[in-house]
Amino acid sequence: MSSFSITRKKTPFQKHREEEEARKKKAEDETARLYQEFVESFQGDNATTKTFVRGGTINPGDKPKVDSEGEKSKDGGSVSKKGSRYVPSFLPPPLASKGKEPEKKREEERPREREKGKTRNIDNFMEELKREQEMRERRNQDRDRQGDSSPSSRFDELPDDFDPSGRPGSFDDGDPQTTNLYVGNLSPKVDENFLLRTFGRFGPIASVKIMWPRTDEEKRRQRNCGFVSFMNRADGQAAKDEMQGIIVYEYELKIGWGKAVSLPSQALPAPPPGHMAIRSKEGCNLVFSGQTGPPIITSVPNQNSELVLTPNVPDITVVTPEDEHLRHVIDTLALYVLDGECAFEQAIMERGRGNPLFKFMFELGSKEHTYYVWRLYSFAQGDTLQRWRTEPYIMITGSGRWIPPPLPVTRTQEHEKESASTYAAGRTRRAEVERTLTDPQRDEFEDMLRALTLERSQIKEAMGFALDNADAAGEVVEVLTESLTLKETSIPTKVARLMLVSDILHNSSARVKNASAYRTKFEATLPDIMESFNDLYRSITGRITAEALKERVLKVLQVWADWFLFSDAYIYGLRSTFLRSGVSGVTSFHSICGDAPEIENKSYADNMSDIGKINPDAALAIGKGAARQELMNLPIAELERRCRHNGLSLVGGRVMMVTRLLSLEDTEKQRGYEAVDEIPKHPQNHSTWEEVKSEREHIKNSYAEVEMKEPVNLPTTIPIPQPELKAFVGKEKNELILPASKWARDDDEADDEQKRSSSSGSDNTGGITFKADGEDLKGNDCVRAQPDNGMDEEQRQKRRRIEVALIEYRETLEEQGMKNPEEIERKVEINRKRLEVDYGLSGPNEGNRNQKSIIERKEKREDSQESSKKRHRGENKSQSPPRKSSTRERDHDLGRDRDRERHRDRDRQHDLNRDRDRREKSSSHDRDDNDRSKERDRDWRRRGTR
């Protein structure tokens, strides 16, 4: 993470303020130093020195005379100056004047000698300034002399005294932090792209610039210069040491440090794969692609070295072996020979003599041997199995050019164009080239995933690795997706890897270069991951383990929804994929991945044949025939777009995508039907059947838009989630296999309730209630038998479809984890009533008629109970003495009667609903039995006619 830290630059105001403070401090120090020297000079002058006093005659009345030299003398003679040379008076005037001239010179030099005796710092500073001025004048004179012979230009070569070791020269301002390299003596064929590829192998480059000639004189020189600015000093130093003296297009490069330039926040993109210059280890030739031909770069042992080029020798083309196994053997052998050197190769040749697999090592002219030699050299230059240089180069001095094989096509042409395109630096955004993980990095990441657990430290370490290699996000996501879709992975490891995906997505918004690519990459692979988790969830036999896995996965999906990483439709599609039942018609993800084409064709053929078998009954009952046909007619691109938008996998082809879309639609409908469950099962006294019916009609109409668009024979389609009927369709077309145990259990419960109610009534009323109930039930049976006898074929088909749909709906609820039988029965009954209303098999009039008959029966029962209670009270009164009733007792009796009436009303409503449900169950069962008996009669008639 440290590579992404950016040093904060100072503003111009801060720089100006610091310069002013430094200048002010320097002036104060200089003033203090001068003042100290001034004080010391005064202290040195206070010391008294002995002087010579010349003797002479002094007359009291005479005044001292002033001689021509400005000296006073009392006797009229000349008095010499202090410290001057003594001249005898008897010498003639000419000789005396000659002696005075050298004396004056000595007097002028003595103050200088006295000053030299005590040196001061200011004197040293002045001497230094003088020396610098003399050196400056000398350089100007040399430059003038050179200008007389040839005019100067910014394209001139470095001077002979230029020191390439890094000491300050003509092009170095002495800044130790500069990263800008001056590249002189460039060939006119060299451009910025060439410099970028040449110097890009040493490190990230900030900018590349070539000073193109402007005047005719500069063009006649036939050489240019340029600047290459690195992002850090170490890379620039390595490039300077390596490229100093290299010959490119017969021009020897002269490299030095240039003036520091401001660095951008982002370096230029590295050269694309296949165009990267590889660093030489032992001074071997290096080849780079130019505009007119491949330039040859060699190390320069001396000043008279020449370009090594043999144009008359044919090129050597490297061809990749067609046999994949042989190519793998050659690649592996080249890697081992590179490590073990000649001794290992010699041992292999001795042991492999006569082995056809190592025949290429002895046939020096074969294509396999050429490929082997090229692989050795390629690995030595730093190439890998997936990436290598594609430009021709000279491997051996005096031989022809070696032309490497083309790179394998692993990316789309559009991505190649993006990676190859470059723009002007600092003006437009450059296309980033997504790199791949190196072999050690990939092995390290795979080891992390194998040992990954739910410990926070391990997940954090793996997440840090992913962010550090965000520029290779594509391969990181590929490895992680592959590990999450393996069928053999254990549950804890798979959950831990899902947590790692969640951590990477959470940090995809961090200020890390290319970190946001993880969200886009995972968005394309998460549907496949959820398909694998669905297979794992449905294969778990333990209920506790399955619930724990379900809780973990759903929590992760909910967290993603809270983070707003993806759209709600996408998250809901992932959740539906994970919770999808096994009877939804979608083939298992792992079975599809094992044999995708055959499964696709087989599933499509089976689907079409099944539709033909169950048509018209099953197809119309499920309500998917027209919708499936409509989706099958859509273009494949539109299907993929819908699946991607809804978080569904694309694996399995057109048929599986259509099946997933239909399953998702059924799940969405089921979510809408959950709202119907909120309707009270036992309506209060103020709630009528018409109100409940209107509310259900409102809910049903809200989903009318998603029903089939093509007309069918039914009034409306069945809006419930239904998988295919393969499990319930036997060999015969119309023979339906129903679980008899379920219906037998319901009938037994109904019979037991009737027996208990009749027995309780007979005990209380002496058989009066039993008679009334029997007559009422007999009447109801007669009324119920009339529509059964007159029921036409269409109504029987509707009843059959409803029962099949309810069976499937019950199994769907059980597979979704619903364990409460009462809750399941309640939802099934609600669905039954809704379907009967939709098909027109029941209505509000029938409900009112049933309510009226049940209410009358309950009133008769309650009247009989009241009469029996009065009779018992009469018997008690006859046995006990009479007692007068008080006002308190009468009030108590009135309150008790009111409570009894309330309980009676509540029980009456409850019994009404229960009887109606029981009657509907029994009627459907009787009709099914009647249908079976009629079918058997028809079969017997057919056999009799035969």
Swiss-Prot record:
Family matches, as InterPro entries: CID_dom, ENTH_VHS, mRNA_splic_Cwf21_dom, Nucleotide-bd_a/b_plait_sf, RBD_domain_sf, RRC1-like_cwf21, RRM_dom, SAP_dom
Region Disordered, annotated ranges: 1-29, 41-183, 740-797, 836-946
Recorded coiled-coil stretches: none
Record domain RRM: where: 179-260
SURP motif repeats: 329-372
Free-text comment about domains: The RS domain (871-946) is required for phytochrome B signal transduction through alternative splicing regulation.
Protein name: Protein RRC1
Organism: Arabidopsis thaliana (Mouse-ear cress)
Name of the encoding gene: RRC1
